[in-house]
Amino acid sequence: MANNSKSELEIVAKYSLEMWKLLRAFERALSDLPDDKKQRRTAQFRYSSSRLDGLLDEAGLRLLTFDGQMFTANLPVSPLNADDVGDPHNAIIESTIEPAIVGQNILIHTGKVILAGGVNVSRD
């Protein structure tokens, strides 16, 4: 997709973002499955995740998550709960709500994160 326009990349990025959210919801639901079904569904999750990564790679895009990292202003994310955290620039990213999506030297989508120590925001 090296020759594709920015709008085509944005469409692929939006679709990938929705697929990523669906995969995360599926991953959370795995813990509720009985053991006899969990192994097969976990394999399906891993396969779908690797396919998404492979397709994004073909398009020249990457999904970036920042769970557990120190929040800094230069990260391509927006903290949803920055007002609820004492000093957001000394906070750890608790979870990624939406990943950042980047192409070659271009930010396609700014990610959304929750900082540790703030009010919990629903992921649904």
Predicted region positions:
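Extended, amphipathic alpha-helical stalk segments that mediate dimerization
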Residues: 1-36, 47-50, 54-124
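Short, charged, amphipathic alpha-helical segments
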Residues: 42-46
